[in-house]
Curated annotation (Swiss-Prot):
Keywords: ATP synthesis, ATP-binding, Cell inner membrane, Cell membrane, CF(1), Hydrogen ion transport, Ion transport, Membrane, Nucleotide-binding, Translocase, Transport. The keyword Endoplasmic reticulum does not apply. It comes from Chromobacterium violaceum (strain ATCC 12472 / DSM 30191 / JCM 1249 / CCUG 213 / NBRC 12614 / NCIMB 9131 / NCTC 9757 / MK). GO terms for cellular component: plasma membrane; proton-transporting ATP synthase complex. The keyword Nucleotidyltransferase does not apply. Gene3D superfamilies: 2.40.10.170, Bovine Mitochondrial F1-atpase, Atp Synthase Beta Chain, Chain D, domain 3, P-loop containing nucleotide triphosphate hydrolases. GO terms for molecular function: ATP binding; ATP hydrolysis activity; proton-transporting ATP synthase activity, rotational mechanism. ATP binds at G148, G149, A150, G151, V152, G153, K154, T155. This is ATP synthase subunit beta. Its main location: membrane. The gene is atpD. SUPFAM superfamilies: C-terminal domain of alpha and beta subunits of F1 ATP synthase, N-terminal domain of alpha and beta subunits of F1 ATP synthase, P-loop containing nucleoside triphosphate hydrolases.
Length: 465
């Protein structure tokens, strides 16, 4: 293939000059001849010069170094050999367990499935987490976002979902760690290993310390592996149901922002890249379910300064089937998971999908909590005594519901000392229905805090008296 030479280096962005009749195409991978570094072409500037992003550190590079064009986009290993392995953005193993034993590779840039290949999701995916199953149920083959500011529990929620779904679900999972803490990636690996499901998980990491090129493309690497599992036919001619976990989708946007100005683009609102919606759409449209197989995706979304109107989380909202919003106010009450029951939504919360009983109980819970929210100002100024008897009852039930929405997690056992609880959906509905009906008005609200099913609250009440 053609060879060129480096003519300019600005951080992660590198300009390479090629002969005019042998210019690489956009998204072609280039390799340095004398160093182990891959570049990805982003723009053709003319006069034989292309602008590229480095998929690694550009330290030690200098002008005039030789670069070879591979003539194809970055491709990564796919298939069963990737399971149980930790790989980087280029699909190279980083777990010191030898090379990935496969010749099957797939380019990280793929077209999204065509409209007529898509399948509509209607089945509910039970998570065992009460607040999620009741108020923002997940769809099999759907897309879910966990929104939250710094330190409200996105990663812990993500880990619990992996614990409850990936272990119960006999299918395959892909975990893409995008710009997050290396420690969390290590914890995740050991968590999977200890629970004997490592052979069903492929892990791709581009952590916080990596250059922006790695963080920009690592989500696509993980997605490409998940797509292969989805499209790979078994003996019955069907694809697989795959789980794709992305932590954190905001860092994907942030990496794009870091290189956008270096690529010569004018920044848009709040300094984000002008191509924000298009970049997000290109990634999200590929995370979808076809008639052959499905990808159920759970994505953590960091919310800068707790502002949900920030362009990055706001752009992500449009692509999701369910949004789980984690609230700092609820976390400050000591209620975990700190899911905001009035802000979190799901397209599946429809009587035609979840059934009348589930829908009625969920809306009853939300209306009780909403009424409590409205009464809080009155209580703060005038006190409880000024409320009508009916409103006092609403407040008492709302406080019980609020506490019953908390739940001990398996992944937090080592910190809290209380064993994790998995609550089946029918138990969740039964519990909240009973609280709304007033069957537990005689129990103290503390009995409902950090328990699993409603029977545990009744047992706990006996120990409180």
């Amino acid at each position: 293939m053609s060879q060129g030479k480096i003519v300019q280096i600005i951080g992660a962005v590198i300009d390479v000059e090629f002969p005019r009749d042998a210019m690489p195409k956009v998204y072609d991978a280039l390799k340095l001849v004398d160093a182990d570094l891959t570049l990805e072409v982003q723009q053709q500037l003319g006069d034989g010069v292309v602008r590229t992003i480095a998929m690694g550190s550009s330290d030690g590079l200098k002008r005039g170094m030789a670069v070879a064009n591979t003539g194809a986009p970055i491709s990564v290993p796919v298939g069963a050999a990737t399971l149980g392995r930790i790989m980087d953005v280029l699909g190279n193993p980083v777990d010191e367990a030898g090379p990935v034993a496969t010749d099957a590779r797939r380019a990280i840039h793929q077209a999204a499935p065509k409209f007529d290949e898509l399948s509509a999701a209607a089945d509910i995916l039970e998570t065992g987490i009460k607040v999620i199953d009741l108020l923002c149920p997940f769809a099999k083959g759907g897309k879910v976002g966990l929104f939250g500011g710094a330190g409200v529990g996105k990663t812990v929620n993500m880990m619990e979902l992996i614990n409850n779904i990936a272990k119960a679900h006999s299918g395959l999972s892909v975990f893409a760690g995008v710009g997050e803490r290396t420690r969390e990636g290590n914890d995740f690996y050991h968590e999977m290993k200890d629970s004997n499901v490592l052979d069903k998980v492929a892990m791709v990491y581009g952590q916080m310390n990596e250059p922006p090129g790695n963080r920009l493309r690592v989500a696509l690497t993980g997605l490409t592996m998940a797509e292969h599992f989805r499209d790979e036919k078994d003996e019955n001619g069907k694809g697989r149901d795959v789980l794709l976990f992305v932590d954190n989708i905001y860092r994907y946007t942030l990496a794009g922002t870091e290189v956008s100005a270096l690529l010569g683009r004018m920044p848009s609102a709040v300094g984000y890249q002008p191509t924000l919606a298009e970049e997000m759409g290109r990634l999200q449209e590929r995370i979808t379910s076809t008639k052959d197989g499905s990808i159920t995706s759970i994505q953590a979304v960091y919310v800068p300064a707790d502002d949900l109107t920030d362009p990055s989380p706001a752009t992500t909202f449009a692509h999701l089937d369910a949004t789980v919003v984690l609230s700092r106010d609820i976390a400050s009450l000591g209620i975990y998971p700190a899911v905001d029951p009035l802000d979190s939504t799901s397209r599946q919360l429809d009587p035609l999908v979840v059934g009348d009983e589930h829908y009625t109980v969920a809306r009853g819970v939300q209306s009780t909590l909403q009424r409590y929210k409205e009464l809080r100002d009155i209580i703060a100024i005038l006190g409880m005594d000024e409320l009508s008897e009916e409103d006092k009852l609403v407040v008492a039930r709302a406080r019980k519901i609020q506490r019953f929405l908390s739940q001990p997690f398996h992944v937090a056992e080592v910190f809290t000392g209380s064993p994790g609880k998995y609550v089946p959906l029918r138990e969740t509905i039964k519990g909240f229905k009973a609280i709304l009906a007033g069957e537990y008005d005689h129990l103290p609200e503390q009995a409902f805090y950090m328990v699993g099913a409603i029977e545990e609250a009744a047992e706990k009440a006996k120990t409180l008296n």
